[in-house]
Amino acid sequence: MFDVALYGHLTHDRILNKFKQSATVGSIGNVWKTLKSINPKLRIDLQPTEIGEALIYINEDISERTSVANLSLYTNYSPNINKTKFSHIIYLNELTNTSFITDLNSTYISADMCAGKQLKDLSVLKNLDFLFISDEDMYYDIEELRLLVKKSVIVHCPSGSICYNKEDTIISTVDIIENINVLGAGDMFAASFINSFLNTSDINNSVTVAHNTVSKLLNNEN
């Protein structure tokens, strides 16, 4: 059995930080990198269903980034489904096919959403235990999302997060880190939460751990 399985988007990211250029593997790559950096012993199954590329501009002066992308140059609508403890789906709202989600053989399932298209078929959320979404991309009725997802909708931002559980709402605050490269911060957050939840099964504590881990990782990378 795998500890974590990653589905959804894998991207070739071309990055411009002012006039400095670099390239990296993004989306699934960001989540995989974070999981392995905080817990190298994790058994991770990589099953990208859509592969594409993105051009990303970073402005460290105001800790922002923007991008244009073609996320679905290549598609595989029949990924291998292996038994795993926790499955995570990257960029759910940009997937051109979500049919594989109902076949996932996993104790827990989560997904995140990104800037771009709105998720049209919200019924797919009924398959999820957790949904991660940035406050920038929050175009939805939170109460509708909370009703659909099995456990929690976690809305995160640079200053913290709001965790909408079935029975309560938990607000977490953190110090904003100024003048940094925030690329991949949302992916780091999801990965850190997943690793903590696998160890503790505690939602609210895992949110706190995720914030602390992301702050540490961003400080180390900048």
Task: Cite the ranges covered by each PLM segment.
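Active-site metal-binding loops of divalent metal-dependent hydrolases
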Residues: 8-10, 136, 188
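Conserved post-catalytic alpha-helical subdomain immediately downstream of the catalytic base
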Residues: 29, 175-222
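Conserved beta-strand termini and adjacent loop/short-helix elements that scaffold enzyme active sites
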Residues: 45-49, 156-158, 173-174
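Short active-site-adjacent structural elements
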Residues: 14-15, 162-164, 190, 218
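Electropositive phosphate-/nucleotide-binding environments in soluble metabolic enzymes
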Residues: 12, 22-25, 29, 92-95, ...
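Substrate-binding N-lobe of the ribokinase-like
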Residues: 2-62, 70-73, 195
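Ribokinase/PfkB-type carbohydrate-kinase core domain
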Residues: 2-6, 58-171, 201
